[in-house]
Amino acid sequence: MSSTKQKLSFASDYMEGAHPEILRRLLETNMEQTAGYGLDAYSESARKKIRAACQADDAEIFFLIGGTQANAVVIDALLRSYQGVIAAETGHISVHEAGAIEFGGHKVLTLAHQTGKITAAQIESALAAYREDANREHMVMPGMVYLSQPTEYGALYSLAELEAISAVCRAADIPLYLDGARLAYALACPANDVTLADIARLADVFYIGGTKCGALFGEAVVFPKRNTVPHFFSIVKQHGALLAKSRIAGLQFDTLFTNHLYEKGGETAIFAADRIRSALREKDYPLAYDAPTNQIFLVLDDAQKARLSKQVEMGFWENLADGKTVMRIATSWATQDEDVDRLIALL
């Protein structure tokens, strides 16, 4: 994001291309001839680094293009035809994937949320309601649980919350899936107490987001235990999601997991977001949600919205009953200090 632009952009965290180090390595290796379909040395190097970061020596790792694709493939691979996936009513698979999960033949079973989070007690209650219903054989069976870290509202699951949810899932013998589209920003947040190793221990599958965290594209799907889904490679292919030139994704993750680049990108975003949050509070802008990560949800009246929108691109979130609007500001790995300075001056 260049400070010379007339209009600042804080609309989302995937507006830029990729971290310059990724582009440098892609250019350096451009004319190399490597094996396809993730069988190249760069993809294998990335897998080794991710296994080390997750403290999961037996993990199977696959590189897919984007988050919706990863969610659709993983969920379809883990569920039987008569099963659905439990998720928050605000979850990405519930509202922002154009029915991709339903298109694959599986119902999203939604639960009420608090800043995008659901609880172990809610999940346990939903599972019990199914078990105790005399007509359950005529109903969609809850077959897995979907969470995201951070949530759509920028909130974080604590380690205790994830441990409780994982325990419920394991007692019910259903998989827990964690969407990590913005995982770099969760890991870098001072309020976070969940590590990659914790996620690998508690979830049956998760993905490490690249698209929103410094890569041109790509998500790394991680199964901590080998053979969780037999022949997952073939399932990816069947969904049209297998990259022939998968080395391009593998190389990006190899770069992100070299010299802590993934963590540094998250830290850049959180530092910028914390500065903006502090300025908003100092200038008495109400915040709609207590979100400690890279997404900030501010409440604007019509005059404030019109004034700021002339110079700052923000994301619309929701209209409130009092006529005000919740707008989202998102920082990223690429946010520049001077752009934060300019935004604060405009408030």
What do these predicted regions represent?
Residues 19-67, 89-94, 100:
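Conserved N-terminal alpha-helix of the aminotransferase class I/II PLP-enzyme fold
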